[in-house]
Amino acid sequence: MTIRNLTLILALLLIFPSAAKAGTINRAQHRDHFTELEVEQIKETQILDKRIGVFVKAIARRLRVLTGATTDTAKQQKKDAELYGALPTGSRADLIGDIGKILDEAITNIDDVSARDEKNPLIPTALRLLANEAKRVVEQLQPFQSQASSDAEVASIEQVTENAESILAAANKLPPPVAKDKKKKQE
């Protein structure tokens, strides 16, 4: 690199200092939709239906913060905090947006496994698990639709609804679950 090029770059940075800061501001404003311990749980959980279970747990934690409702005992809350970290924080729009992103990531996980092995027996199980949670999410977020106070909230609710609808549509295409016989019928 020549001195002339360096001089030109420095001059541009002095003239447009906001351009240099733009990258750091965007990174600082980026919000991760999982806590650090949730990410660790996801990385450790390689079996599809169990991994989707971690996504479902992450969604349930955000719904608990949004609604303020909990049915967990103090012992269960302590165990969850050890496994998944502190409950997530943020505005209502942030938490609803997190749920939309988590649903999207769960869809991607199922799609990835399906692309590699269409006949994987865990796909229907994982999809049904996710569909049950998607249905619950839509039901619990309905009151928030009328209370939405910002465009970000409205957009987040729309994203969640769209993801939930695609999950439910895919689950409706599944054949009925096969009942597992724990014991063979005796003749």
Model regions and ranges:
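Bacterial N-terminal signal peptides
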Residues: T7-P17
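Long, charged/polar, soluble alpha-helical segments
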Residues: A22-E187
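Positively charged n-region of N-terminal signal peptides that target proteins for export
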Residues: M1-N5
